[in-house]
């Protein structure tokens, strides 16, 4: 049976018109069909409509790509009966689906340290998470709420990209090998089509995997490490409002 490319792209919610026409060739789409056939019997995250969320940003508009490894394999239950699960993965690296405010409990150390690093960027001070939350609540430190923050940065051209796009429930790293070839080709494509992209490569895994493929890399510790806070890669990225101040005004 002939491959119906348009149908596959629609099913996977891939926004090919945003500069990805040359990337999603017939061979590439067949590659995706093969990957999805491999994982279809797993409970995997994120939801199928969010796997290719990165295509929401037109290639020509990308200013910065913050590289993660694979989606969160954790989840929460949608109700007290614990019948339906809601994945923490959203299709954007480091974003946590269940976090609506910065005062919510942050289990993921990466997101905690990202918030601390943003506070350090604005104040030059390294502070505890509790103190930062107090300053957010009192209005002394302004930053958009978590989901609004990710949305706002995406609108400015910041892509939060995992090099592995799916994960099996409760099994971090379970799909990494499935996505290696696809991810390497995607990185090369984005770098070629938009050589001005600044790539935040946090941790040795990202640096070793991608560093030689891209023009403009910002190398830092992984966000789960405390050293990330003071290294603060955000200060090296051009023309990005990391807090939402322009929206506030």
PLM feature segments, named:
Residues 214-244:
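Short, flexible loop segments at boundaries between secondary-structure elements
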Residues 2-10:
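Low-complexity, highly charged intrinsically disordered N-terminal segments
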Residues 14, 21-194, 198, 206-208, ...:
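A polyanion-binding, active-site-adjacent surface
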Residues 246-249:
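Cysteine-dependent deubiquitinase/ubiquitin-like isopeptidase catalytic cores across multiple families
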Residues 208-214:
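Short loop/helix-cap segments at secondary-structure boundaries that form the rim of catalytic
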